[in-house]
Regions:
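Residue-level detector of beta-strand face positions
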Residues: 25, 120, 212-214
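Short strand-coil-strand connectors
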Residues: 29, 124, 216-218
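Extended interaction regions within the primary functional domain
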Residues: 93-96, 133-134, 142-155, 207, ...
Length: 222
């Protein structure tokens, strides 16, 4: 069975230990493949290299990777997007990379303080958001066109945008797990992440090839 756009992640600590990777070039059959090197722990050094590979059925594909600690990062068309924005009554919605709330923060205030109610991430196929509250439900945005849309609609598609072919929120998450979420399980029933010391959402990587969003709960009493 052929694999199309199969995700590949290279651990740079294992395969390029000691090299401060600033640029990476991935080539297959003479064609450059978009890739990205991500710093996932905030130490300003790349931890992982991500790209997608096409692998033929019952065959093989050779991808050659060149890493550099001096070249400038390579630029590729954006295929993904992730953001975390603060709610602003003036409509500016400033973008932040991480936000942490104390465990006793009011759930509704926390939920409403973020534009879109949580971290948003998308590919050209679909978009998702993770609610910043004790549910942490994942909501789904369906698309009719192969493109990035969140910077245009922000999950709140207008009638005019719908008429232009934009997608929209297609799932009522409510109290469910939505498109999937982390929950506890007590007395044969799923339960929310209620008693914590703090809650945090962080955008660890924002394209162009992949996005990485971290949802963390500190000191959960379960």
């Amino acid at each position: 069975m052929a694999r199309k756009a199969y995700p590949v992640v290279v651990d740079l600590h294992s395969h390029a230990d000691g090299l401060h990777v600033r640029s990476a070039k991935v080539v297959c059959d003479g064609r450059e493949i978009p890739s990205q090197a991500d710093d996932l722990n905030g130490d300003f050094r790349a931890d992982e290299l991500a790209f997608t590979a096409d692998i033929p059925a019952q065959g093989e594909a050779v991808y050659r990777i060149t890493l550099s600690d001096t070249d400038a990062p390579r630029s590729y068309p954006r295929e993904t997007r992730a953001y975390l924005k603060l709610h602003d009554e003036k409509g500016k919605h400033p973008e932040v990379k991480s936000i942490t709330y104390p465990g006793d923060a009011d759930l509704l205030d926390m939920y409403n303080s973020i534009y879109g109610h949580g971290a948003v991430f998308e590919s050209r196929l679909a978009a998702f958001r993770i609610y910043m509250d004790n549910r942490q439900s994942i909501d789904l945005y369906g698309k009719t066109s192969y493109r990035l849309e969140m910077d245009s609609t922000g999950f709140y598609t207008t009638p005019e945008q719908l008429a232009q072919g934009y997608g929209c929120d297609i799932l009522w998450a409510g109290q469910s797990v939505g498109a999937g979420s982390f929950r506890g399980y007590q007395n044969d029933k799923p339960c929310y992440i209620d008693t914590v010391a703090w809650r945090r959402q962080t955008i660890l990587a924002d394209g162009p090839v992949r996005t990485v969003v971290e949802v963390a709960d500190g000191g959960w009493v379960y």
